[in-house]
From Swiss-Prot:
<comment type="function">
    <text>Transcriptional regulator.</text>
</comment>
<dbReference type="InterPro" id="IPR045865">
    <property type="entry name" value="ACT-like_dom_sf"/>
</dbReference>
<feature type="binding site">
    <location>
        <position position="88"/>
    </location>
    <ligand>
        <name>Ni(2+)</name>
    </ligand>
</feature>
<keyword id="KW-0238">DNA-binding</keyword>
<comment type="similarity">
    <text>Belongs to the transcriptional regulatory CopG/NikR family.</text>
</comment>
<feature type="binding site">
    <location>
        <position position="96"/>
    </location>
    <ligand>
        <name>Ni(2+)</name>
    </ligand>
</feature>
<dbReference type="InterPro" id="IPR050192">
    <property type="entry name" value="CopG/NikR_regulator"/>
</dbReference>
<feature type="binding site">
    <location>
        <position position="90"/>
    </location>
    <ligand>
        <name>Ni(2+)</name>
    </ligand>
</feature>
<dbReference type="GO" id="GO:0003700">
    <property type="term" value="F:DNA-binding transcription factor activity"/>
</dbReference>
<keyword id="KW-0805">Transcription regulation</keyword>
<feature type="binding site">
    <location>
        <position position="77"/>
    </location>
    <ligand>
        <name>Ni(2+)</name>
    </ligand>
</feature>
<protein>
    <recommendedName>
        <fullName>Putative nickel-responsive regulator 2</fullName>
    </recommendedName>
</protein>
<keyword id="KW-0804">Transcription</keyword>
<dbReference type="InterPro" id="IPR010985">
    <property type="entry name" value="Ribbon_hlx_hlx"/>
</dbReference>
<keyword id="KW-0479">Metal-binding</keyword>
<dbReference type="InterPro" id="IPR027271">
    <property type="entry name" value="Acetolactate_synth/TF_NikR_C"/>
</dbReference>
<dbReference type="GO" id="GO:0016151">
    <property type="term" value="F:nickel cation binding"/>
</dbReference>
């Protein structure tokens, strides 16, 4: 196994340690390995999607971070043909949640998602989607 060193904000490390305690982990290293595996699986899942998709992108950001709201708006304008609706929620004094309803080519939706992920001030981004071709059975 390789040994690495990393810097984390104290609050993030405290929250991570709390999750590890709640889940009964005996080792922080094991928790980090599991978290990294989950991150890789989510990345692979996102890259394996193809075709037309419909879904939501949930974005949590610190609106006190200079320029983040403008950057998010600019990106959304660049991908407006894939965005059906946006809902904005004030979570706390500092944090906002945007839920973006998307539909279209998954490559463009993935591109949109990844551009928002890279922004400074954005703390969490999650894409959830399904194929537009999926048949939904209704009971009558």
């Amino acid at each position: 196994m390789m040994r690495i060193s990393m810097s984390l904000p104290k609050k993030l490390l405290n929250e991570f340690d709390e999750v590890l305690r709640d889940r009964g982990y005996q080792s922080r290293s094991k928790g980090i390995r599991d978290a990294l595996k989950d991150y890789i699986v989510r990345y692979q899942w996102m890259n394996e999607m193809e075709g037309e998709r419909i879904g939501i992108i949930a974005v949590i950001y610190d609106h006190h971070y200079t320029g983040v709201m403008e950057d998010l708006a600019d990106i959304q304008h660049d991908y407006r043909e894939y965005i059906n609706a946006v809902m904005h929620v004030h979570m706390t004094e500092r944090h906002c949640l945007e839920v973006i309803v998307v539909k279209g080519d998954v490559a463009k939706i993935r591109e949109l998602t990844e551009k928002m992920m890279r922004l400074k001030g954005v703390e969490h981004v999650r894409l959830t989607s399904t194929s537009t071709e999926q048949k939904i059975e209704h009971e009558h």
